[in-house]
A protein has these predicted regions:
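Mid-to-C-terminal alpha-helical segments outside catalytic/metal-binding sites
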Residues: 2-12, 18-54, 217-222, 235-270
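Hydrophobic faces of well-ordered beta-strands that scaffold small-molecule active sites
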Residues: 7-11, 55-57, 84-87, 108-112, ...
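Conserved, mostly hydrophobic/aromatic
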Residues: 10, 47, 74, 102, ...
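Short aromatic-enriched loop/helix-cap "lid" or pocket-rim segments at secondary-structure transitions
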Residues: 17-22, 68-70, 98-99, 153-154, ...
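Divalent metal-binding pocket/active-site signature
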Residues: 36-37, 61-65, 91-93, 105-187
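Acidic (Asp/Glu)-rich catalytic clusters
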Residues: 44-51, 71-82, 98-107, 127-136, ...
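Short, well-structured secondary-structure segments
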Residues: 51-66, 73-75, 80-90, 111
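Active-site-adjacent C-terminal substructures of enzyme catalytic domains
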Residues: 167-172, 179-237, 243-249
């Protein structure tokens, strides 16, 4: 297959002072052994080893008090040209002013994690938050499905996610983990909708024939390669996508061109 730009649309990194402690806690809670140390330097090293050109860092403000610190780190990570760092806002934070700061700082996307941030994706109380994000033109990526490190209830189960689709039509919205981590049968109700889906969390858990079917039933141009690094070895994710029985053009799109088009539409200039 001809080599084109490879973009990992879903990774995580933490400030050096917090990375070791954070990774230990997350690994203990989830039962997953990480493939990296959670630092920016570790992410860049992994990218070089795997041939990944760009990575999106999905930062998460897990409570209102940490929102500013999370976003200052997000801005600093963008000093590395290989990284495209997204910000995050908590529903209970002063998100209007924080979104303005992020916009002025060149951040082009926002990550929300309903489980960590303790809101149901279809709760009308968060509609103003969605509107504030989208009216500023941000790309919006959600964790969807289960999170084994958090437990029940699942705040962004596919049936709940489907309820918010009308407000996202025509917007740049990504549902991570193919629409529902560990809930892929239920996530079929999202296929064909006007959203992007990313492939993070799928290689070792979602059968190749199943994800191939989902990709073809959705819109292959709205599928984004993603690894959730450091929770997945990017080499595993790359091999998984490259092995799927899809046309080379479709694979090139998934591995980078789809993300490149989306990111460039928000000024990334890739």
């Amino acid at each position: 297959m001809e080599v084109h730009m490879i973009i990992d649309f879903h990774t995580h990194a933490f400030p050096d002072a917090l990375a070791m402690r954070t990774m230990e806690k997350l690994s203990q809670n989830s039962g997953f052994a990480p493939a990296g140390n959670g630092t920016v330097a570790g992410t860049l090293k992994s990218m070089r080893e795997c041939g990944i050109d760009k990575s999106v860092i999905c930062n998460i403000a897990t409570n209102a008090k940490q929102t500013k610190n999370v976003n200052r780190f997000a801005v600093s990570a963008n000093e590395h040209p290989e990284l495209i760092s997204f910000g995050s806002v908590h529903p209970e934070s002063d998100y209007e002013s924080e979104l303005d700061f992020l916009k002025e700082s060149g951040i082009i996307g926002i990550k929300l994690h309903p489980d960590y941030q303790q809101f149901f994706i279809n709760d009308p109380k968060v509609t103003p938050l969605y509107e504030a994000i989208l009216k500023r033109g941000f790309i919006l990526i959600f964790h969807t499905g289960k999170d084994v490190g958090v437990g029940e209830p699942t705040h962004a189960a596919p049936d709940r996610s489907r309820e918010v689709l009308p407000m996202f039509r025509g917007e740049k919205v990504v549902f991570a983990h193919m629409g529902g981590f560990l809930m892929w049968e239920e996530a079929e109700i999202l296929l064909g909708e006007d959203i992007y889906l990313d492939t993070s969390g799928c290689p070792q858990l979602l059968a190749p024939e199943k994800i191939t079917d989902m990709i073809l039933r959705h819109n292959p141009k709205k599928i984004l390669f993603a690894t959730d690094y450091p929770w997945e070895n990017p080499k595993t994710g790359l091999e998984y996508i490259r092995s799927l029985p899809l046309a080379d053009e479709v694979k090139r799109g998934i591995l980078g061109e789809n993300a490149r088009t989306l990111l460039n539409s928000n000024g990334a200039e890739l």
